[in-house]
Amino acid sequence: LEGNVRGTGVHACGTIICRDDITDWVPVSTADDKETGEKMLVTQYEGSVIEDTGLIKMDFLGLKTLSIIKDAVANVKHTKGISIDIDTIDIDDPTTYKLYCDGGTVGTFQFESPGMQKYLRELKPSTFEDLIAMNALYRPGPMDYIPDFIDRKHGRKPIEYDIPIMEKYLKDTYGITVYQEQVMLLSRLLADFTRGESDTLRKAMGKKLKDKLDALKPKFIKGGIKNGHDKDVLEKIWADWEKFASYAFNKSHAT
């Protein structure tokens, strides 16, 4: 069924930005706002292709956790007379890491499920990078890599790189490709992809565009060979990236 349109819908937080009257650029229809009942203008083009028309799509998200933090800061000020600047909280606080190591994360956004708590107790996170990686890995597909990630962190399995220079971008994740940004950087390092080409690779992975991935492969292999890398190793790396595309996640979002 993938790729076939079954019905229409409205993204909960997707907003299209246009410098002119939007009807000069794309066809529009109307839909009812579920909260207010008001009529909204909705593009008839699907979100994945709307930017090809020259428009910008932004997702503006609300998060209840942020409201809870705001209320907590206000309560501390009211009851204790202490002013807390949430933007300067120490991300290396030992007491906080102990909570994560103990799986004491109930009420913590993205870290409160029983499964995540179990893996946190096994991982014993010691750096902010560990937490970012767990956030990215704890989803269907990449979850299979979590045991390896944990074993490599604690030295129970060796950290290996297909090509030694890949350590530059895979060191923080113990040799496992976790983020789209790592693939972007590695494509430039290994095969001299331009910034634009590496971003095209990221988009192709994020949106699972097999045709675009297939079109980029010969350039990667050719560029890698030119830089002195073994063709068979390059083929393996690309095959790993193709599997990675099924769950590719960007680091900025995980952070």
Question: Where are the regions a protein language model picked out?
Answer:
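Mg2+-dependent phosphoryl-transfer active-site scaffold
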Residues: 1-248, 254
